[in-house]
Amino acid sequence: IGQNRSDNPVRVSAAEEPVKIMALGDSITDGYFGTDGYRKYFYHNMTEMGHDIDMVGAKDYSGWNPSYTDSNGVTFEYDGDHSGYSGYAIQYMTGTETRQGLLETVQSTDMIKKCDPDIVLLQIGTNDILSNYNEGIIDRLENLVNVILEDMNDSDDVVFVSTIPYMDVLMVYDWFWSYGEVKSDNSQEDFAKIVHGYVDSYNDQIKQMVTEMQTQGKPVKFADINSVIDPSTDLQDGIHPNETGYQKMGTYWSNLVDDYLSTEPETTTEETTSADKYKKGDVNTDGEINVSDLIVLQKYLLKKGGILPEQ
């Protein structure tokens, strides 16, 4: 896991085995307010692009593929396996509000080692901000990502770490009771700006964290779900996406992963020295040492032929 890898080695759907992908996160990954959320669109899009993928997760549909009919009347099957947990924070938190932790669940289920994903799509942190657990939020996320990386079985696995969407604070104003005086001492509009500021700060820190981890040679990639969700039109209840929002997420994720899988890995061209080119005894320099070399040598000794000068 700690190796330097600037290329994209997991590649590809042309491989003999499908690419195993785990959607990991909170209720937005689980698909709250929408049948399996963005995951059904992601799977459908990826297969339409020609990729052979296997969705994996601690929540296993045991080989049964559900079906869904989209707004255009198109019915498709998808792989529903995932690791999305409604109400979860990055790690277990208790104080003003108790939240179960994704970190502890990853560890207790041993899901990464057991499911062996090639790619993890991680989006988590909305409930931390909702419950006013903003202090230390990026440290908790980095710890979670490192635990995932440590549990990954192959050196060419990768974790995509995503930003989180904005919340429509005014729609779910009462849900932010954990903010206490910060909430009561400000107008609703000003409080909404404060919460949006926490989201902005967290998302900026995610991008910076991914960049720093990449410089350390860790296989992480940045994803920006925040960029595709409009809180004024794409949310069902102020927190969770509606079907339009989930579809946008599925499109974003599938385009991002398709680009990753379809990009040719970087190759290193090594300089070849004369010592690499010619083997001792390979008189005719054909890369092999056999009777042909003996014939050339005999001709040389009989002055009926020659050999290449020394290199």
Q: Each predicted region: which residue ranges?
A:
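Low-complexity, acidic Ser/Thr/Pro-rich repeat tracts that form intrinsically disordered stalk/linker regions
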Residues: N4-V19, T267-S274
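Residues in Ca2+-coordinating acidic/glycine-rich loops
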Residues: G25, E243, N284-E288
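Loop/turn elements at helix/coil->beta-strand transitions in domains of secreted/extracellular proteins
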Residues: E16-K20, M49-D54, C115-L121, N153-F160, ...
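Histidine-centered active-site loop/cap adjacent to the catalytic His
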Residues: I21-L24, D234-E266
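Substrate-gating cap/lid alpha-helix
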Residues: D168-A223, E243-K248
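Conserved SGNH/GDSL esterase-like catalytic core that processes O-acyl groups on lipids
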Residues: I28-D139
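Alpha-helical segments with a strong preference for the paired helices of cellulosomal dockerin domains
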Residues: S274-Q311
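Active-site-proximal beta-strand/loop segments in catalytic clefts of secreted hydrolases
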Residues: L24-I28, V56-Y61, L122-N127, S162-M167, ...
